[in-house]
């Protein structure tokens, strides 16, 4: 393998690690923040702050002119990935346990593969086997976490998440097909500010802005919000969007399989939650499936 190819492979591995770990911790951060902030206010604040910082960085650098295609890409990412994808996640976090919510997001790789298949790109056999194994691991993990019958609000939240993953997969595919942004950081800021504006409107419709206790937020809440703005939003999103340009969208979407594993391990390590042998076996099956999806394309 040549040096440029080796460097590219290393960057891809690092980017995947950033996405896997960063987004795997988002559920925990949202869980704590929702104790003090309404859902759409939380989403709007997070992405207004992150988008504003990305825009400030862009304005401090030499600027290429905005292309017409930049607006189409920003609308696709801002609406489908941020407003819908993240908005549904934050909203559902009120009604669903963190682990189950992360499990529902594992439908994203399934939608991505189905979309690629419908558009004429049949996945390799090992990728399909990996999807089956990873899906089985998630079902096993979910069966280990199920309790009493879900309420109507929980069913609605779960259905909303599944619909959001379908729209996320469509948005990721659209971004991959469109020309790259003339400036990657400006493109990131445009997507975040568009998404934040829509989340703010959702909050207005939902009545969230009538309950805005930012002046009384605890120090812990501010730290969690800072974590979501800096390492997660300004660290994970650039890595994710770069990966969409470098590898198939269905491969990038494997983060959704790893998220429940990260959430489960965080609960075990930080919250002293029990990790049963069944849950551990489910995690190993999920990681095996993800490995097959990744290496099955080589």
Where are these regions (language model features)?
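Juxtamembrane helix-entry segments on the extracytoplasmic side of multipass membrane proteins
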Residues: 8-12, 36-40, 44, 66-72, ...
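Specific transmembrane alpha-helical segments of multi-pass solute transporters/efflux pumps
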Residues: 22, 26-27, 55-105, 140, ...
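Helix-helix packing/entry segments at the starts of transmembrane helices
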Residues: 43-45, 86, 100-107, 174-197, ...
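Transmembrane alpha-helices of multi-pass small-molecule transport proteins
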Residues: 11, 34-84, 109-115, 133, ...
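Specific alpha-helical transmembrane segments that line the substrate/conduction pathway
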Residues: 41-52, 81, 89-122, 138, ...
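Glycine-/small-residue-enriched transmembrane alpha-helix faces in small-molecule transporters
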Residues: 1-41, 149-177, 197-201
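Hydrophobic transmembrane alpha-helices of multi-pass small-molecule transport proteins
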Residues: 54, 107, 123-145, 199, ...
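Hydrophobic/aromatic residues within transmembrane alpha-helices
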Residues: 33, 42, 46, 92, ...
């Amino acid at each position: 393998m040549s040096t440029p190819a080796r460097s590219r492979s290393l960057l891809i591995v690092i980017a995947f690690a950033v996405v896997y770990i960063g987004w795997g911790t988002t559920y925990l951060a949202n869980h704590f923040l929702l104790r003090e902030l309404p859902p759409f206010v939380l989403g709007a604040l997070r992405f207004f702050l992150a988008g504003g910082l990305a825009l400030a960085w862009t304005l401090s650098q030499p600027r290429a002119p905005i292309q017409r295609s930049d607006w189409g890409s920003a609308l696709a990412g801002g609406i489908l990935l941020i407003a819908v994808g993240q908005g549904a996640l934050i909203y559902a976090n009120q009604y669903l346990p963190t682990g189950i919510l992360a499990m529902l997001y594992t439908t994203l790789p399934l939608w991505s593969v189905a979309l690629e298949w419908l558009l004429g790109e049949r996945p390799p056999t090992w990728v399909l086997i990996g999807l089956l194994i990873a899906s089985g691991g998630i079902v096993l993990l979910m069966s280990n976490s199920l309790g009493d019958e879900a309420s109507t609000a929980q069913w609605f939240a779960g259905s909303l998440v599944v619909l959001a993953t379908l729209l996320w997969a469509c948005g990721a595919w659209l971004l991959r097909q469109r020309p790259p942004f003339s400036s990657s950081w400006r493109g990131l800021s445009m997507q975040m500010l568009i998404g934040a504006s829509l989340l703010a409107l959702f909050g207005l419709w939902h009545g969230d802005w009538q309950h805005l206790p930012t002046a009384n937020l605890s120090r812990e809440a501010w730290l969690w919000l800072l974590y979501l703005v800096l390492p997660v939003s300004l660290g994970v999103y650039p890595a994710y969007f770069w990966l969409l340009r470098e590898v198939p969208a269905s491969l990038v979407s494997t983060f959704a399989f790893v998220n429940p594993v990260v959430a489960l391990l965080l609960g075990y390590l930080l919250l002293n939650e029990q990790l049963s042998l069944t849950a551990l076996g489910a995690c190993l099956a999920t990681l095996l499936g993800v490995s097959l999806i990744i290496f099955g394309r080589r």
